[in-house]
């Protein structure tokens, strides 16, 4: 049923550490966000186990959960070739199926190539965009580039600046300036270039990047909180949040000018990063040693002699290793191919990557390389192993080399649970040398019900980590690490948040709701019923 037409401004706050952000609101540091909280209805959002997929914006852009047409991970494993790749979305945008005029700006995982009824620009400066840069109408992309220019903080989107205060300051300055550029671009799109909208939906990802790089500056419990860079990191994170507040102020003022409702939200919460080192480095090496009885990871003695330390890559001999020369080397095939590609003019490289299978065609999903992840360097041995660690951005993910599922499987279906038990026992035996505590918090086995039917983007075992391990100490396999931290912030916050300003809701506390309720709420406020394949329930529904 279609109801009266209304206007909505949706603001994606990608991603907030909610308690910390609201403390700044209470101090008066973020007046625009505080105004939304005071005049609107505040809902805490629970993303559940879907938060670990790292695909929050695919859930928003498509309206689908991992259990309803979505996927459990952006990392796709090919059981025929044992290759892995990180894929963007291949799902249609939810708002394409809503009978309202929608304009978007940098909404991640919203593929405008699959949308005829959605206008705007995507892939300009999003954190994990999930799509190729595109615009609708197509000529807008060139016009936008001429007016706004390229995204100015690209080198800092995934930076790890903690070793120096100057890099923390530079990251914060660049992201704050980029957010101000984003604010100007959003204002132009919504009020001048494409003003005839029912839904204007803009997302900022600068705080996401800032928290991942600078979190140690505001978290007193973080192992790097007393590092010389921490003060600069804390100031820098506050600076980026202030820029976000200016972004929110401009969009909410524009919404008020046309009588539009406002939905500002963060699908999940941010906090300390506990996963990069264990998932990307330590777990792959542990399983390699368990399989072959020898290490692949070669660390400097200066690090190994101090197992309870967190190496600083810019101190002592670590300075020579700051580029990651301690990471297991690529295979000869990978090195030769990478060297050959570097000799080709940049404008020709995309065609080569497509022909080689590392990017799909124009109609397929965007594809990003995973060669930078240490876990990928173990790939040549996966077919010989009973269990191996997949590249991961969050939790540890273990794949069993199962017969009749993997092309060169070595584990029979009858051995499946026993091998899982064995791998879990190996990982649970590991301790953090810095604290003496176990490194594992929880273990899940997604494939138990149907091992042969496990999807290529899923794992047979998923591990969440306890504490901040820079090293594993196993009673038989020895010390692995320590290695330097990567991101200091991660996707560990308990809740996201939504601030909804609408006459359809009473201001105040709305309690805890599912993160999947955000998209149905936006559609409901527009005066439409959500399409059947959109998950969740409108926040307007008690």
Predicted regions and their residues:
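Active-site-proximal N-terminal segment of extracellular/periplasmic enzymes that hydrolyze or transfer
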Residues: 1-41, 534
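Beta-sheet entry/capping signal
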Residues: 7-9, 42, 101-103, 187-188, ...
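Secreted, luminal/periplasmic, and some membrane-associated catalytic domains
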Residues: 13, 43-46, 51-55, 74-97, ...
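Short, structured active-site-proximal loop/turn typified by the sulfatase FGly-forming signature C/S-X-P-X-R
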Residues: 22-60, 67, 103-105
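Non-catalytic, well-ordered alpha-helical segments in soluble enzyme domains
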Residues: 34, 95-96, 337, 414-433, ...
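Extended, H/D-rich, highly charged conserved domains that either
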Residues: 111, 127-194, 206, 211-219, ...
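Active-site His/acidic residue clusters
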Residues: 191-239, 277, 394-396, 400-414
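Low-complexity, glycine/alanine/valine/leucine- and proline-rich hydrophobic stretches
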Residues: 464-519
């Amino acid at each position: 049923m279609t109801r009266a037409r209304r206007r909505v401004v949706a603001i994606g706050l990608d991603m907030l550490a909610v308690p910390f952000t609201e403390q700044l609101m209470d101090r008066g540091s973020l007046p625009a966000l505080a105004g939304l909280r005071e005049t609107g209805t505040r809902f805490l959002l629970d993303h559940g186990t879907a938060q670990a997929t790292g695909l929050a914006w695919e859930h928003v852009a498509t309206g689908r959960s991992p259990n309803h047409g979505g996927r459990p991970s952006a990392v796709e494993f090919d059981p025929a070739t044992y290759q892995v790749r990180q894929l963007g979305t291949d799902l249609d945008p939810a708002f394409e199926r809503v009978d309202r005029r929608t304009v978007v700006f940098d909404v991640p995982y919203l593929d405008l190539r699959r949308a005829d009824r959605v206008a705007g620009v995507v892939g300009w400066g999003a954190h994990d965009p999930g799509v190729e840069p595109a615009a609708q109408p197509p000529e807008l992309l060139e016009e936008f580039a001429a007016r706004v220019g390229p995204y100015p903080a690209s080198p800092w989107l995934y930076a790890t600046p903690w070793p120096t205060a100057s890099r923390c300051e530079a990251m914060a300055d660049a992201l704050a300036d980029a957010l101000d550029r984003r604010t100007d671009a959003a204002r132009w799109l919504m009020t001048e270039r494409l003003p005839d909208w029912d839904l204007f939906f803009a997302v900022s990802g600068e705080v996401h990047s800032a928290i991942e790089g600078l979190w140690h500056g505001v978290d007193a419990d973080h192992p790097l909180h007393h590092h010389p860079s921490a003060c600069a990191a804390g100031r820098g994170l506050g600076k980026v949040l202030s820029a976000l507040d200016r972004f929110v102020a401009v969009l909410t003022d524009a919404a008020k000018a046309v009588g539009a409702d406002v939905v500002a939200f963060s699908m999940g919460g941010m906090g300390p990063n506990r996963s990069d080192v264990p998932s990307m480095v330590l777990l792959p090496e542990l399983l390699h040693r368990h399989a072959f009885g020898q290490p692949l990871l070669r660390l400097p003695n200066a690090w190994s002699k101090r197992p309870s330390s967190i190496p600083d890559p810019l101190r002592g001999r670590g300075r020579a290793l700051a580029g990651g020369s301690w990471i297991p080397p690529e295979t000869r095939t990978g090195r030769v191919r990478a060297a050959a590609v570097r000799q080709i003019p940049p404008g020709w490289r995309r065609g080569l990557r497509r022909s080689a299978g590392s990017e799909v065609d124009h109609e397929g999903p965007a594809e990003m390389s995973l060669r930078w992840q240490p876990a990928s360097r173990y790939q040549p041995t996966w077919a010989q192993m009973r269990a191996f660690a997949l590249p991961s951005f969050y939790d540890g993910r273990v794949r069993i080399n199962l017969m009749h599922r993997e092309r060169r499987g070595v584990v029979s279906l009858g051995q499946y649970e026993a091998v899982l038990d064995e791998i879990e026992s190996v990982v649970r035996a590991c301790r953090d040398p810095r604290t003496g505590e176990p490194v594992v918090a929880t273990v899940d086995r997604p494939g138990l019900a149907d091992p042969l039917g496990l999807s290529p983007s899923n794992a047979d075992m998923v591990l969440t980590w306890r504490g901040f391990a820079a090293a594993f100490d196993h009673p038989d396999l020895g010390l692995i690490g320590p290695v330097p931290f990567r991101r200091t912030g991660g996707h560990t916050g308990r809740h996201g948040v939504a601030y909804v300003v609408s006459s359809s809701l009473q201001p105040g506390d709305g309690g805890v709701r599912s993160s999947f309720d955000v998209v149905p709420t936006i559609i409901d406020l527009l005066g439409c019923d959500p399409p059947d394949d959109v998950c969740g329930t409108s926040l307007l529904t008690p």
